[in-house]
Regions:
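Short, glycine/polar-rich helix-capping loops at beta-to-alpha or helix-loop-helix junctions
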Residues: 140-152
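A charged, well-structured terminal subsegment
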Residues: 103-104, 164-189
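A short, well-structured juxtamembrane/interface segment
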Residues: 19-37
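Short glycine/serine/threonine-rich phosphate/pyrophosphate-binding segments
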Residues: 49-54, 119-126, 148
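Glycine-centered short loops/turns at secondary-structure junctions
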Residues: 38, 108, 134-135
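Glycine-rich, small/polar surface segments that engage phosphate groups of diverse ligands
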Residues: 34-105
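Generic N-terminal amphipathic, Lys/Arg-enriched alpha-helix
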Residues: 1-19
Length: 189
């Protein structure tokens, strides 16, 4: 077991080392711009990526907002079960994000989607709608990149295909984004 744990630990370090810090820095700038311009930020994903989106929305919306003195307008589209079940029941599961974006998204807003494969149909459809309607789009994906990487304006690739390691690296990126504002609130100006 020790050997397996060491191997997993090495692979996780490699996944974290693959995080493109220049792209993370660019995303910090996009978030700061959204804050200054009072833009809405939408995040969404499935499974573990959905959990990361929820966590990110909480940390940015509460923790980072408390530090910078202005509120980030961020919402995780996978948190409203009533919306998701109504849309998936009446339309299709792949429509759950883009339908919500139709109601709430406006040109200039920011959409960030997390997916290990980059091919989740609901994430692809949400990003595609957002881009076609003037929202800024970001895909945070694993090494397979997928369709999302072809659609998004900005792409952050974690160079691994293992779901656990990519999801852990996603959360590390989300924490970097939040703590950039918590620990250096002047960047919000």
């Amino acid at each position: 077991m020790q050997s397996w744990l060491e191997s997993y630990h090495r692979a996780q370090k490699a996944a974290l080392d693959s995080v493109p810090l220049a792209q993370v820095d660019k995303l910090v700038s996009l978030l700061a711009q959204c804050l200054r311009e009072d833009r809405q930020i939408f995040v969404f994903g499935n499974g573990g990526s959905a959990s990361n989106c929820s966590h990110f929305a909480t940390d940015l919306g509460k923790g980072a907002s408390d530090k910078v003195g202005k509120r980030f307008r961020i919402i995780s589209l996978n948190d409203n079960v009533s919306w998701m079940t109504a849309i998936s029941n009446d339309c299709a599961y792949e429509d759950i994000f883009y339908y919500q974006l139709q109601n709430f998204g406006r040109p200039g807003d920011l959409v960030i989607s997390l997916s290990v494969s980059g091919n989740s149909p609901n994430c692809v459809k949400g990003l595609d709608w957002a881009k076609k309607n003037g929202l800024k789009t970001v895909a945070l994906v694993g090494a397979k990149r997928g369709r999302m990487a072809e659609i998004a304006d900005e792409v952050l690739v974690i160079n691994d295909t293992h779901y656990g390691r990519v999801e852990d690296a996603q959360m590390t990126i989300c924490h970097m984004l939040c703590y950039a504002f918590m620990e250096q609130p002047a960047i919000a100006k």
